[in-house]
Curated annotation (Swiss-Prot):
It is found in: Cytoplasm; Cytoplasm, Cytoskeleton, Microtubule organizing center, Spindle pole body. The lineage of its organism: Eukaryota, Fungi, Dikarya, Ascomycota, Taphrinomycotina. This is Uncharacterized protein C1685.04. Residues 1-32 are annotated as: Disordered. Residues 135-223 form a coiled coil. The keyword Cytoplasm applies. The keyword Cytoplasm applies. One of its GO terms (cellular component) is mitotic spindle pole body. Keywords: Coiled coil, Cytoplasm, Cytoskeleton.
Length: 325
């Protein structure tokens, strides 16, 4: 069951859990750098987009550098927005490829219909040709001629009448023979032409297999886009909430206070307020990470782990800062 998203401000204050250990990893024991390297390992079958994915990876590395090496903290908003924009581009690319696969399927379907129609014509022509060869009229005429020949020998007095009948029937036979021969030749030529047309292109079975592959790719990409869009909305809301927390911290500690080295001495009231805000924020981030884990939003999981470590470090720094008189 997927977890429901809860805004940062609605979480109750809890004591900090999951502080960094001596080796710079979270309490889960998973290095955020290692997890970021695994983001796009399983996307080959759906048609990945290396340029966008490498850009996302680069932004994640840059975010980690800014958060943990105290370099240009003012770039946090830019980096977070850039990550969101790249994820949106990735979704759009998936959508465009899915539409392309659908277009290719339609073209193959048209060719499939054409080949199927040719097959139908071939079968119909074969059936008609078989009927021509089995026509009973030719057999009946030949039988009548044989009977008349026998009657000529027996009934000499009726020779003239029988001869006329025979001549008439012979002419009819010749007429039928000529017509049927022409019809048979025409049908044989038609059959040969249709067979050549069919053999000149991919057969129906091959087209069906290619259509099936394209349909699977389209379905997979559309599924990935459908799964990624909620993650995008979730990540954008999270960015706004983190920025709101930082604004509150700056209002309490001063404009340069987000760097650990620049923390000013705090009064007891300031210290209590900041610790409460950081503890609540960490609890909210942990819950958000569980939601991302349950939905397999890998880039967002890495971002959340970086933010958690960043706020845990700040909490540690605030805890060790002496109280100002």
């Amino acid at each position: 069951m997927k977890q429901e998203y809860i805004p940062l401000d609605e979480f109750p204050n809890k004591s900090n859990e999951g502080m960094l250990n001596d080796e710079g990893t979270s309490s889960s024991g998973l290095s955020t750098r290692t997890r970021s390297l695994e983001l796009f390992d399983n996307m080959e079958e759906s048609g990945s987009f290396p340029k966008v994915e490498r850009k996302i990876q680069s932004l994640l590395d840059e975010l980690a550098e800014v958060l943990f090496q105290s370099k240009q903290p003012n770039d946090l908003t830019r980096i977070r927005k850039a990550i969101a924009e790249q994820l949106q581009l990735w979704c759009q690319a998936c959508q465009e490829n899915a539409d392309l696969y659908r277009s290719q399927q339609r073209k193959l379907k048209s060719r499939w219909d054409s080949q199927t129609d040719i097959l139908s014509q071939i079968e119909s022509t074969k059936a008609s040709l078989a009927e021509v060869h089995k026509a009973e009229e030719i057999s009946n005429l030949k039988t009548s001629i044989t009977h008349l020949d026998e009657e000529i020998q027996i009934l000499q007095e009726k020779l003239a009448i029988v001869t006329n009948q025979r001549n008439t029937l012979v002419k009819r036979l010749q007429t039928y023979d000529n017509l049927e021969k022409k019809k048979a030749l025409s049908m044989e030529d038609r059959l040969l032409t249709l067979q050549e047309q069919y053999d000149a292109h991919a057969n129906v079975s091959s087209l069906e297999k290619r259509m099936e592959v394209l349909k699977k790719r389209e379905d997979l990409l559309r599924l990935m886009v459908g799964q990624a869009l909620p993650g995008m909305q979730f990540f954008q809301r999270l960015i706004h909430q983190i920025q709101a927390v930082e604004t509150k911290l700056i209002s309490i500690l001063g404009p340069t206070s987000l760097s650990e080295a620049a923390l000013p001495p705090l009064t007891d009231v300031q210290r209590t307020s900041v610790l409460s805000l950081l503890t609540s924020t960490l609890h909210s981030l942990e819950s958000a990470r569980q939601i991302a884990d349950s939905n397999t939003w890998k880039p967002i999981i890495v971002c959340l782990e970086l933010e958690i470590v960043y706020f845990e470090n700040m909490l540690t720094a605030i805890t060790s800062t002496p109280v100002s008189s």
